[in-house]
């Protein structure tokens, strides 16, 4: 069904980040029609993630201003460009910052969920076709972000960056499967491949850390140790599968030694869900000699480096990283939505606040106060 706006420029509301650390403002933005291989999506719900804040803060070397941030969302296809066959107007979709073209060296390798097709464009805030933005305000271009830009009532994405999902799924909930929840679950299931009976340590009990706990519980982990400097998070974490808690502030010894002592030599798997390089070292060094695996999930600030003694690795520990939990976006996000509909994974429980796009600055404040897991913004109000 063709929409009445197909082929036309749409003027809509979007939250524009004009410069680093300056509050975003709601603006009337012109969104151009999709070109070949592109999809224009009406965003209905978008959540906030720490990655959005990281770029907005000015610490991201790839951060470009002015831009429209946002990458965890859900909506409905408004129109498609030439050659787009996998989605059509009216389809319910989740935009995916991790593309999946199924044709590049990465996609064909069978070894990774990374995709090389559009990264050269999305990394600099433009679309592949003409290396230009589809967003503008009175003729002035506004950069895209992560190939998604979901803090807008309409966005344009590459067709390799959009997953068609079951229309029965509530978009205000499954939008979370566009980043945080999927990342945590996949870190356990795909990257670490945690087995039943394993002892797991999770550093950082935000949305991603709690999703790691949920994944570890479903994998049959025998002990799931949550580590956070905010003890208020511990009650909530129990609901996601965490069995015991450690606050590093309560101990004089280095946290890795505390965990090693608690676990008869170390954990089988650890997950760093903060993005702090010193914590990444602790997470590795609390792993058991001979077989312990540590997965870096959190994104550290640009230019920071990790370090440990080589002996840690020589004696059998493994250090790994994960992006989007190792999930192939277009193929597996629809599968995750089905798991949610079958009540096999939690999603609703991560949504602690619901607001409107116009409240975006207040929502970012909440994210930083620590009492908020995911705040979902409705764009149509």
Curated annotation (Swiss-Prot):
It comes from the Eukaryota. NAD(+) binds at residues 50, 204-209, 228, 233, 274, 297-299, 322-324, 374. SUPFAM superfamilies: GroES-like, NAD(P)-binding Rossmann-fold domains. This is Alcohol dehydrogenase class-3. It comes from Oryza sativa subsp. japonica. Belongs to the zinc-containing alcohol dehydrogenase family. Class-III subfamily. One of its GO terms (cellular component) is cytosol. It is an enzyme of class 1 (oxidoreductase). Zn(2+) 2 binds at residues 101, 104, 107, 115. It catalyses: a primary alcohol + NAD(+) = an aldehyde + NADH + H(+); a secondary alcohol + NAD(+) = a ketone + NADH + H(+); S-(hydroxymethyl)glutathione + NADP(+) = S-formylglutathione + NADPH + H(+); S-(hydroxymethyl)glutathione + NAD(+) = S-formylglutathione + NADH + H(+). Its main location: cytoplasm. An alcohol binds at residues 51, 71.
């Amino acid at each position: 069904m063709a929409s009445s706006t197909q082929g036309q420029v749409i003027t809509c509301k979007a939250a524009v980040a004009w410069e680093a650390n300056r509050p975003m403002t709601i603006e009337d933005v012109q969104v151009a029609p999709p070109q070949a291989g592109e999809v224009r999506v009406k965003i209905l719900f978008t959540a906030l993630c720490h990655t959005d804040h990281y770029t907005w803060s000015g610490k991201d070397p790839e951060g470009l201003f002015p831009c429209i941030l946002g990458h965890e969302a859900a909506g409905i296809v408004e129109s498609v460009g030439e050659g787009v066959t996998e989605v059509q107007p009216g389809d319910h979709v989740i935009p995916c910052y991790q593309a999946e073209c199924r044709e590049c060296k990465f996609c064909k390798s069978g070894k990774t969920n990374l995709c090389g097709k559009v990264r050269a464009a999305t990394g600099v805030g433009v679309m592949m076709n003409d290396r230009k933005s589809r967003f503008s305000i009175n003729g002035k271009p506004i950069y895209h972000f992560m190939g998604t830009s979901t803090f807008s009532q309409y966005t344009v994405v590459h067709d390799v960056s959009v997953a068609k999902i079951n229309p029965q799924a509530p978009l205000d909930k499954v939008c979370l499967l566009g980043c945080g929840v999927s990342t945590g679950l996949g870190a356990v299931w795909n990257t670490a491949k945690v087995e039943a009976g394993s002892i797991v340590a999770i550093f950082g009990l935000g949305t991603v850390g709690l999703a790691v706990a949920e994944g570890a519980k479903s994998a049959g982990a025998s002990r799931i140790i949550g580590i956070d400097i905010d003890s208020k998070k511990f009650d909530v974490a129990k609901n996601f599968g965490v069995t015991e808690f450690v606050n590093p502030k309560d101990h004089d010894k280095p946290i890795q030694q505390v965990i090693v002592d608690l676990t008869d030599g170390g954990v089988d798997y650890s997950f760093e869900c903060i993005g702090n390089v010193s914590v990444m070292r602790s997470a590795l060094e609390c792993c058991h000699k001979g077989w312990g695996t540590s997965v870096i999930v959190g994104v550290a600030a640009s230019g920071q480096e990790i370090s440990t003694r080589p002996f840690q690795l020589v004696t059998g520990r493994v250090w790994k990283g994960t992006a989007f939990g190792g999930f192939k976006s277009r193929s597996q996000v629809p599968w995750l939505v089905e798991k949610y509909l079958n009540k096999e994974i939690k999603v609703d429980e991560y949504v602690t606040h619901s607001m409107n796009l116009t409240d975006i600055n207040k929502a970012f404040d909440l994210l930083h106060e620590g009492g908020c897991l995911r705040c979902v913004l409705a764009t149509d109000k």
